[in-house]
Amino acid sequence: MTNEFANNAPAERLHNKRVGRELAMQYIFQCTLTEEKFSAASWNAFLEQASEEHNLSTNRYGRKCREYAEKLIEACVSDSERIEETIRNVARNWAPERISAVDHATLKVAIAEMLNFPDVPPVVSIDEAVAITRDYSDERACDFVNGILNAVKGTLNRPEREGIKA
């Protein structure tokens, strides 16, 4: 599972939150496939490999990417039951085993962000999750992820952010 997110020139690099979301999704995906528990040791091993693979240096940009990924993973772990229940509630017609591991990991990260990061508008979480799905899955999965996350957005007890008025 490789994406070229960090191999770009600095001016073209993706926002560190985007890279953090991808790292979190990749780590959750890896833990799902290996049935490994989330731990500092497995996270550090993953980061070592991901940092090399994606050329994430120890500079401020790389550090910010890792920090955001860690916050998302912590939210995924601490809120795991609520996230899984949310997925079950909004994906009523989908048996959990029908959701691919990549799409499930992407949903978990996006839902964790929507539930726990009030400074991030839900539409941003949705757009980012759909973009990540497009990079790691397929177009049909994009529609599925978008539909699930829009349904989650409808259940949130958060005020919508207003756009800037001209």
Range-by-range predicted roles:
Residues M1-D135, R140-C142, N146-A166:
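N-terminal interaction/assembly modules
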